[in-house]
A protein has these predicted regions:
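OB-fold and OB-like single-stranded nucleic-acid-recognition modules
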Residues: 21-163
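Positively charged n-region of N-terminal signal peptides that target proteins for export
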Residues: 1-4
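Bacterial N-terminal signal peptides
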Residues: 7-16
Length: 163
């Protein structure tokens, strides 16, 4: 029985190391423009059901962040953004952070936010938001880069993603 647990632990560590080894760090853009949101804009326009890894978003909070309590993955913070799109258009997008994996990330109204993580399609219950970005933390599955969120120049997670 002990050897079974050791085998499972070793396999888990190898899988985590492989995921971390394949994940890459993506730099934060120097300015928030429609070009930063181009991939997200295409996903929104195509009504993509998602999820889609490695998507960037930037914008300004339209109100303060709010907490989403509990659940199987702990507390989350919801950051409501207005993002610039091509042609002077805008969209409302929600960035979701995980207190356990990212630290407690909050933002006041009017905060500049950049995030990189996994796109998800919103439900009618989440309107007026047309999309969301979550998994803005170190990669937890194969194919995902290390995610992050930046609020008014402060980057989260604040620890390195390297093992």
């Amino acid at each position: 029985m002990r050897s079974f647990f050791v085998s499972v632990l070793a396999a888990s560590l190898l899988a985590s190391a492989a995921c971390a080894a394949s994940a890459r760090g993506v730099p934060v853009p120097s300015a928030c423009t429609a070009a930063v949101n181009a991939r997200l804009s295409a996903l929104i326009a195509g009504d993509d059901a998602g999820p889609v890894d490695n998507v960037m978003v930037c914008g300004t909070t339209i109100g303060p962040s709010r907490v989403q309590r509990g659940g199987p993955h702990g507390d989350h913070q919801l950051l409501p953004l207005r993002i610039p799109l091509d042609g002077g258009r805008t969209a409302l997008v929600e960035v979701v952070t995980n207190d356990s994996l990212d630290g407690r990330v909050t933002a006041p109204r009017g905060a500049a936010v950049f995030a990189y993580g996994q796109y998800f399609h919103t439900s009618l219950r989440q309107r007026p938001f047309v999309a969301g970005i979550h998994d803005v933390h170190c990669a937890t599955h194969r194919g995902a880069d290390d995610g992050w969120v930046v609020v008014n120049g402060t980057k989260f997670p604040q620890r390195s993603c390297a093992f």
